Every structure is written in structure tokens, then in C-alpha cells.
Amino acid sequence: MRTVRYTTEALRNLKRYGTVATRVRKAMDDYAADPAAHANNVTRLVGSAASRMRVGDYRVIFVETPVELTVVRIGPRGGVYD
């Protein structure tokens, strides 16, 4: 199982979207434990080493390594890619 790490910006985003924070944390923990379970919700971003996961109307931008997932940003569907 890989560990999930959150950047300072991602933690700020989690506090801002409090009601969604629980769902985001659970989705990332589930993906870290079994990537195949959420494979249809994860897409590699074009021109970047990052990937994104869909959690309802929110997107989680993260970087994957063999030992950890680093969550970079969390936000609503339209503005998270800016």
C-alpha cells in the first residue's frame, strides 16, 4: 500500500471544501490501497507528470510514485486546472 501525502495547498483546499473532504480522503486512501478499483476515475494529465481523480464535481490533482501519492490540488471541476 502506498502512502498519501497532501501539500499545504491541498490541505487548505480540503478545509475550504469541508463537506467533500471526507469523500476525497476516502477516495485517495482507496486508490492507494487498490489502484484498479478507481482506474475509471483516474486520468493522466496531458503535458504533466500529474494525474487527476474525479470525486463527484471535484477534481483531485496528484503525482504518483511507486511508494506514495502526493495530492497537489483539490477543487471544483472547472477551476482546478488553472
Tell what function each PLM region has.
Residues 22-23, 45:
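Lipid interaction determinants
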Residues 29-54:
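A short, surface-exposed loop/turn module that caps and links secondary-structure elements
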Residues 1-5, 11-12, 17-22, 55-59, ...:
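Enriched for short, Lys/Arg-rich terminal
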